[in-house]
Amino acid sequence: MNIAAKPPLTIRLCGPRGFCAGVDRAIQIVVLALKSYGAPVYVRHEIVHNRYVVEGLEAKGAVFVEELDEIPAEHRAQPVVFSAHGVPKSVPEDAASRNLFYLDATCPLVSKVHKQAMRHNRLGRHVVLIGHAGHPEVIGTMGQLPEGSVSLIETIEDADAYAPADPDNLGYVTQTTLSVDDTAGVIARLQQRFPNLTAPAADSICYATTNRQEVVKQAAPGCDLFIIVGAPNSSNSKRLVEVALRAGAKKSILVQRAAELDWDEIGAISTLGLSAGASAPEVIVNEIIEAFRARFDARVELAETVQETENFLVNRELRSIELTAADMAFVNG
């Protein structure tokens, strides 16, 4: 097919998109640990929720486990990395009891939520955590506090049904990757029911989640299709699909790789929105664009709201190790 025969397509490419500072830092920690200590480096849980990233790190020598007892005795001297989502307090305690050397890749913004929750608890408040049951970040945050001192609220319906023992002594925090609008609704309902509910000192939803949702909102109206690059277990990616639909996209889908695209289902479109969750690498965004260019006379327009400059330092033990562009080429291209 020659270019003249290809139907025209405008791709609204969202910015910011893809990796946030916390994800970048977590991946860098694994890469630098491999350079410093050699393979294998063990990682408890997926370092970030993206199979492409996980498989790329496995190819470099990382070994992913769900529990510390999966690490063979002969490799106990090798480092184990905790994922960006954070872990309960019991996990580093377990690592110490096994004489494991661990590197914590918890996102600093997740650690901030841990501190907010602990402050509520220290001041005698029962903690209300707004988040999704079973998500590793929620498990990690709940695991910072004594059992029974945290209540999980997922929806407005949960907020309506919530019956705390002491309704005048509550403090809330949220998962960092939630829908900004949905969370605002849940908080408003809780505040309506419990006027003395104490907010955290700073917003728990992270800058990257907010920024990616905001630009998708702006780009979605008029889009025949909105593609979010991300994994099905990525909370922030799934929220972007919902945001695109609510903001006016006719259809929105979550895609991990270009090979997943169903061209018969996509059909005839003239405007495509494209963004990526905070754990999705730029190489996959480029892969998606090239797949559309092969079938359409595609023109890319940048839809940008803000430029992100945040950068989080890696663990002190790794800061003397040089990180090169080649080290990160598997995700950055």
Swiss-Prot record:
This is 4-hydroxy-3-methylbut-2-enyl diphosphate reductase. Its EC number is 1.17.7.4. Catalyzes the conversion of 1-hydroxy-2-methyl-2-(E)-butenyl 4-diphosphate (HMBPP) into a mixture of isopentenyl diphosphate (IPP) and dimethylallyl diphosphate (DMAPP). Acts in the terminal step of the DOXP/MEP pathway for isoprenoid precursor biosynthesis. Isopentenyl diphosphate binds at residues 49, 85, 135, 234-236, 279. The keyword Metal-binding applies. GO terms for biological process: dimethylallyl diphosphate biosynthetic process; isopentenyl diphosphate biosynthetic process, methylerythritol 4-phosphate pathway; terpenoid biosynthetic process. Dimethylallyl diphosphate binds at residues 49, 85, 135, 234-236, 279. HAMAP family: IspH. The keyword Iron applies. It comes from Rhizobium etli (strain CIAT 652). NCBIfam families: ispH_lytB, PRK01045.1-4. It catalyses: isopentenyl diphosphate + 2 oxidized [2Fe-2S]-[ferredoxin] + H2O = (2E)-4-hydroxy-3-methylbut-2-enyl diphosphate + 2 reduced [2Fe-2S]-[ferredoxin] + 2 H(+); dimethylallyl diphosphate + 2 oxidized [2Fe-2S]-[ferredoxin] + H2O = (2E)-4-hydroxy-3-methylbut-2-enyl diphosphate + 2 reduced [2Fe-2S]-[ferredoxin] + 2 H(+). InterPro entries: LytB/IspH. Its cofactor is [4Fe-4S] cluster. [4Fe-4S] cluster binds at residues 20, 107, 206. The active site is at 137 (proton donor). Pathway: Isoprenoid biosynthesis; dimethylallyl diphosphate biosynthesis; dimethylallyl diphosphate from (2E)-4-hydroxy-3-methylbutenyl diphosphate: step 1/1; Isoprenoid biosynthesis; isopentenyl diphosphate biosynthesis via DXP pathway; isopentenyl diphosphate from 1-deoxy-D-xylulose 5-phosphate: step 6/6. Keywords: 4Fe-4S, Iron, Iron-sulfur, Isoprene biosynthesis, Metal-binding, Oxidoreductase. (2E)-4-hydroxy-3-methylbut-2-enyl diphosphate binds at residues 49, 85, 135, 176, 234-236, 279. Pfam families: LYTB.
